[in-house]
Amino acid sequence: DTSVSRGLGDVYKRQNTGYAVLRKKSNEITMVECGLISPKKGKEVSERLYTIFFETNNLIKKFKPEMLYVENVFYGKNVQSAIKLGQAKSSVMLAAEHNNIVSKEFSPREIKQSIVGNGSASKEQVAFMVKKIFKLDDKVLKKNDISDAIAVAWCGINRT
């Protein structure tokens, strides 16, 4: 009998929140779905955060992950950016808690180490490994947010 686990990885940014749902059966990890949550530009902050919460909540209901994995961003280029990232991250984690799903945070270094084998890897190296592992084309990874979310989910599903 083999166990199956599902993990949802989220990467939250100012404009888009990337997500990836991975499935692990025995030692095989497969991609179930990946994409972007894109709140409408020009909306109030509360509306944008609600969209992130609502869409993450829908993903949880659809895929029923056992865990939700997020990147622990502990610095920002400036204070405003750090605050906005923290707000978006909170929306994602609240959706997990709302559904009684445990969320686990990983540092950027841990995520890069897990997918590339080098904690100091560049965004390009992360995207390259994601493409290679899951045999994805450039259209799927049109935004770094998607490859980052896949890397977060990969890290999480391999460590839990």
Provide a role label for each language-model segment.
Residues I101-K132:
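Short alpha-helix plus adjacent loop in nuclease-associated cores
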Residues I60-V73:
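Proline-aspartate-enriched helix->loop->beta-strand connector
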Residues I133-T160:
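Acidic, Mg2+-coordinating catalytic module of metal-dependent nucleases/exonucleases
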Residues Q15-S46:
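Short glycine-rich, Thr/Ser-proximal phosphate-binding strand/loop in the N-terminal lobe
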Residues K43-F63:
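Catalytic-core regions of hydrolytic enzymes
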Residues A82-S91:
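Charged helix-capping and loop-helix junction motifs
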Residues G76-V79, K112-S114:
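Short, solvent-exposed loop/turn segments at secondary-structure junctions
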Residues D1-L8, Y12:
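Single conserved hydrophobic/aromatic residue that forms the stacking wall/gate
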